[in-house]
Amino acid sequence: MAEECSCEWPQAEAKEQAVLISAGAVFLASGAAAVLRNRPRWFWVWLAGLLAWATIPKYFICARCENYDRPCGFMYGGKYAARFFKRSDRPFNAAGYFAEGGSLAVFQFLPAIAARRDPKALVVYALTAAVFQSLLVKIACIDCVRFARDPWKARYCPTFKIVERLGLATPERTG
């Protein structure tokens, strides 16, 4: 059962979400460009990884999250998931973890592998990835660490653990 929290999870701010979504679009464009420029036959695999990430983990993770059907800081993920999936009362399990990790591995690492001999494309991709990931932590993950009551987030999410260990946020749960 989720622990009680004396705090209210903040709604996603439109300006922050616009910045995050824009940075994500630039990151995706640089990834697509790196693949198309260096390994064009890999593009469909990369696109399949992206589409898999945009759907499958949203069922296994977002449809089970306390922010389901709410405009959370992860690119309005709770609202996005509610458009495609019914809320699931099933507990988080390894399927969500593997769906997220597997699809992320395909669409985030294929551009770097494709551009390994193209320094310009590799630097552009690495910079856009760093900016997007930094914004994601700042805009979404810090609030998730502070306000999440779903115990599986602290137990399984690697970014949750990194944010906590770096001291960027601490959970405000009460026991």
Locate each region found by the language model.
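Long, highly hydrophobic alpha-helical transmembrane signal-anchor segments
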Residues: C5-L50, Y97-A129
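Aliphatic-rich, non-membrane protein domains
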Residues: A2-I21, I56-K58, L135-D143, F147
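Membrane-proximal soluble regions of multi-pass membrane proteins
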Residues: I56-R90, I139-G175
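C-terminal halves and exits of single transmembrane alpha-helices
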Residues: G78-F109
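Hydrophobic alpha-helical membrane-embedded segments
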Residues: R37-E66, A130-K138
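Eukaryotic polytopic
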Residues: A114-A148, W152-K153
